Amino acid sequence: MKRPLVVLLHGLARGHGSMAKLGGFLRREGFETWSRTYPSRRHSISYLASTLADEIIEVAGDRPLFAVTHSMGGIIVRHLQDPRLHWSRLVMLAPPNQGSQLAAGLVRNPLFRWFYGPAGAELADSTSWPAPPAPFAVIAGTRSLALTNVTSWTMGRRFPVGVKNDGTVAVEETRLAGMTHFAEVDATHTWIMNSPSVRRLVLGYLREGAFPA
């Protein structure tokens, strides 16, 4: 059996460097990883997915694929439906699978649309998004306020009192029918991928298809 390639997909207005520490951890554990910075603020989700699909196919060929995604990266992977992509397992970190309440509240704001672009506006409505192309797990953060997450102290107050969230995405927004595993961790949205608890869960799912006990 060919060795799987782990695709790391960053979130909106981020770059591949945001996944670097997680990628280094996975490589030390014996995995081969691939990531790149894609222009998340310039294009629609479907366009970004189409472009990434071609690049992944060129690198991976017919190898089995795993993915670890952050935030909008999870929505991108839901759109990576090209049959030439041989997905096996996916782990989504803080994905707005039900759409983003924050995006919905700000989608008509010209500054929001200018900064976050077409894809940011699309995060307001999840009704047309396809199901993930492989078995998948979801990890949600619950630390609603953190200095490292600017959104948490500028827009996080838009969440109703008592709604668990990571400062950017509500826990309930991360859930999706069909997920094989779900976990909550004490982490904020921006750097959830660097949490030791998240690393442990990701490693277990990629190796065994299940979160460790």
Where are these regions (language model features)?
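Helical cap/lid subdomain of alpha/beta-hydrolase-fold lipid enzymes
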Residues: R3, D82-A213
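Serine-dependent carboxylesterase/thioesterase catalytic core
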Residues: V6-G17, K21, F25-P135, G156-R158
